[in-house]
Amino acid sequence: MARILVLKSSINGSQSQTSTLIDTFLAERQANGHADDVIVRNLVDADLPMLDSELFHALRGAANPSERAQRAIVLSDELIAELKGSDLLLIGAPMYNLNVPTQLKNWFDLVARARVTFRYTETYPVGLVEGISAIVFSSRGGVHVGQDTDAVTPYLRAVLGLMGIVDVEFVYAEGLDMKPHGFDAGLADARRQMDALHA
């Protein structure tokens, strides 16, 4: 049984293509005999605090944190415990204005913590989150894979790698806003990528 943490960050609710892809992926795992323990974090509903100077320093261990900062530390610890307790991380990361949703960035700002999920050395940071693989489901209105306009892929690889998560796969649903056939073609291509992951 795999312990799966799902992060949904689309602002489109039930119309979200990344959430639909994740739900389909999980349903197919179940159909294939996997009895997974799944935790779903809807980051839009969670309304995570945005990193500012107060929270930044509190999460790095500053003395005498305010009540607000203490709540953020407790939340950060909870999110990190969920992450470290997982075997597989599924991330819904639609592209908004060439980048990840703010809600997803807020989650990473709470879990990427020095001395907790990574540590500094004399050369490079070393990740402290071990034994977890990740699959990112990313929908886009245009076609961006392999282009300078794709800031989503390098950012997610880098921030996951910072914490030690280096086994990362991507499922892209691209060109969804391109007429007349982009939507159907983009989802069909994502479907093929998902099939390859199940193989």
From Swiss-Prot:
Cofactor annotation comment: Binds 1 FMN per subunit.
UniProt key word Nucleotidyltransferase: no
Disulfide bond entries: none
Gene3D superfamilies recorded: 3.40.50.360
Top-rank taxon: Bacteria
Reactions performed catalytically: 2 a quinone + NADH + H(+) = 2 a 1,4-benzosemiquinone + NAD(+); N,N-dimethyl-1,4-phenylenediamine + anthranilate + 2 NAD(+) = 2-(4-dimethylaminophenyl)diazenylbenzoate + 2 NADH + 2 H(+)
GO MF assignments: electron transfer activity; FMN binding; oxidoreductase activity, acting on NAD(P)H as acceptor; oxidoreductase activity, acting on NAD(P)H, quinone or similar compound as acceptor
Enzyme Commission code(s) on record: 1.6.5.-, 1.7.1.17
Coiled coil: none
Pfam annotation, one family: Flavodoxin_2
Keyword Flavoprotein: yes
Alphabetized InterPro entries for the sequence: Flavodoxin_fold, Flavoprotein-like_sf, FMN-dep_NADH:Q_OxRdtase_AzoR1, NADH:quinone_OxRdtase_FMN_depd
Key words, A-Z: Flavoprotein, FMN, NAD, Oxidoreductase
Cofactor: FMN
Chain residues that bind FMN: S10, M95, Y96, N97, L98, S139, R140, G141, G142
Family: Belongs to the azoreductase type 1 family.
Complex formation: Homodimer.
Biological role stated in the UniProt entry: Quinone reductase that provides resistance to thiol-specific stress caused by electrophilic quinones.
Protein name, as recorded: FMN-dependent NADH:quinone oxidoreductase 4
Provenance organism: Burkholderia lata (strain ATCC 17760 / DSM 23089 / LMG 22485 / NCIMB 9086 / R18194 / 383)
Lineage: Bacteria, Pseudomonadati, Pseudomonadota, Betaproteobacteria, Burkholderiales
This protein's encoding gene: azoR4
